[in-house]
Amino acid sequence: MGKRITSSSNPQNNSPQEALHASEGKGSYFLNLDHWAQSWAGFPKLDVPVGEKIVEEFKPFLQALGDAGYSKKTLKRHADFLWALGGEVIRHVNEEPADRKLPARELLLRHIDETGGPYWPHAYNARDRNAFNSVCRRLYRFMTKREEP
């Protein structure tokens, strides 16, 4: 999935909250949010700014998961599926350029709802597709404040 950056320190010592500081240059064993927008970009000058705004929408959700005490493995899995969701949203804005002008929150809410996320063509199997949809539903509930993560 996304590019993973490993820390030079022992990953077992990193708390989930510390992992979320990758965007502040501290590194982590699985998250490096600053590189996500670039990894999604088919057209860097157009896609990176949109991608960066999407990442900013993901950060409070990931932070809430970390604060709720979710395990590193669960955080990593959620992050992987969020990375996939971001890629699908960017693919969509390349097909519908007018959507590039939408605020990131609105753009995301056009792609996720109480049933899950957009079609994800890179799912290896039904289990991955179901897990992806579960994360999208959880993000939707978080963004619409219907439920905490």
Label each PLM-derived region with a short phrase.
Residues 1-149:
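Charge-rich, intrinsically disordered N-terminal extensions
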